Structures are given as structure tokens and as C-alpha cells.
Amino acid sequence: MFPPFLFPFLRPVPAAPDPRGGILALSSPPWSAPSRRTEDMSAEGQLGIFLDRYLYSRLEEAGRIRSFHRVRDRSGQLRGTDVILTAPEGGALRLDEKAQLYYLNRDLPTFAFELLFLRQGCLTPGWLCREGLDTDRYLLVWPFARRDRPKGIRWTDFTRVDCLLLDKAALLAWLSGQGLARGRLLREAADLRRAGERRRDIPGLPDAYYVASDPARYGEAPVDLVIRRARLLSLPGSLGFRASPAGLEPLLRF
């Protein structure tokens, strides 16, 4: 079941008028941009600042969550946790943020889940198939910005994000019900790589297919399972929403 404390997401969180003539977020607590000396200058880090400012901080201020904590240490991130949300009545959710940063402004109707990648020349399970991770939910992000490439992007360049909060267990259960348990996903991803194929459809499953990246373009050469986001939104516990400087609103359809 979806955590009860997140049901209020279904009501829009509007922006409040700024008496100075601009837009002041409903949940804008005292907040200042991080120092350039200390902030993570990677595209992922910059997107994290945007999410902290326009998503998590608003939810905290509105009482939808008690608090949020961004995990800074590399070991925690490698265990599949970027942000921890605490419910008003206690309890926590560990979120793994996944963003399509190399498809800025593309509004793709799908999302790619990593099955395998190359590490020092060896095939290694990707984040969807890796065992032992702490992830409870994925926060899938389709970002929009004033630029089309992630290199050198700043958090102020982002204009909005369309997000899908996805229950990891619900996703894996749905895949297993389609005959795509972890073992089969890994075998088919490895077979796709060995065969040198770039794409392979899945018989009887029009909402998903396999894609292998070109090793000449991407060093890790991931093999992904691509799933239509309309299907992802239909899974139990899934919730879509849009966050921007203008406010936070639900996305009931993609």
C-alpha cells in the first residue's frame, strides 16, 4: 500500500503570491543557495538542489512530511539512498533519485531501468537488479531546463521537473508477474549484449523493451529495460507530480 502520509500529494500545493510581485512557494522556509565551494557541481547534484528547494522543502513546510534528509556520503548513495523522507507519525522512506538528465526537455514517454553495465570489462548488475540495496521508492525525474545539455548545468537552469514516485517492490512484483524476474532480466540483458543487438522487444508486453547502449559512446555500456511511464503510473502506490518555482501539482496522467 502507498504510505498514508503521502496521500495528501493528491491535492495540489499551489504557490503563494509574493508581495514583491513574484512567486513565493507555499512551503518556502528560510533557505539560501548553497555555497559554490561546497555544493555538488555535477548535474545530479544540481538537480538535487532544485528538488530540495521546490519539492521536499514544500512538503515539509506543508506538513506532508516531517522532514527530509539528503544523503551526502557516497556509501549511502551506493546502497541506493539519495533522500530519506520521514512521515509525520514516524517511519521513513528511502528514495533513490533517477533522472533522465541526458534527455533534457525531451518529455520522453518512457523511463530506462538499468539491468547491466560494464565495470572494468565485466558485466555487472545494474541498479534495478542489484541485490542488497536499501531503496524503498524510486523518484523518477523528467527534467526541463533553459539548456539542452547537462554539462555545466546549474540548479537555477532547471525550470520544472515531472516526477513519478514509484514503489520498488510494486515494480518488481509486476515484472515478476510478466515472467521478468531478476534472473531472466539479467540473462536476457547479457544475451542482448553478446548478440550485439541495440533493441529487443518483449513478446506479449508492448509497454516495455530492452535497449543496449553503444559501448563506443558510453563507457559503462548499460543494458536497460525501458518501460512506458503510463504503465509505471498505473502500478500500485505510484504517484506523479510536477514541481517548479510556480508550485507543486499532481500529475494523474502522463
Which residues does each predicted region cover?
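Acidic-basic catalytic patches of nuclease active cores, encompassing PD-(D/E)XK
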Residues: 7-10, 21-77, 108
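Catalytic cores of nucleic-acid endonucleases
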Residues: 38, 99-153
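N-terminal interaction modules that seed assembly of large macromolecular complexes
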Residues: 71-89
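Residue-level detector of short, conserved catalytic/binding motifs and their immediate flanks
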Residues: 81, 93, 136-138
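Conserved catalytic cores of phosphodiester-cleaving nucleases, focusing on short active-site segments
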Residues: 83-85, 91-102
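Non-catalytic C-terminal interaction segments of nucleic acid-processing enzymes
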Residues: 146-254
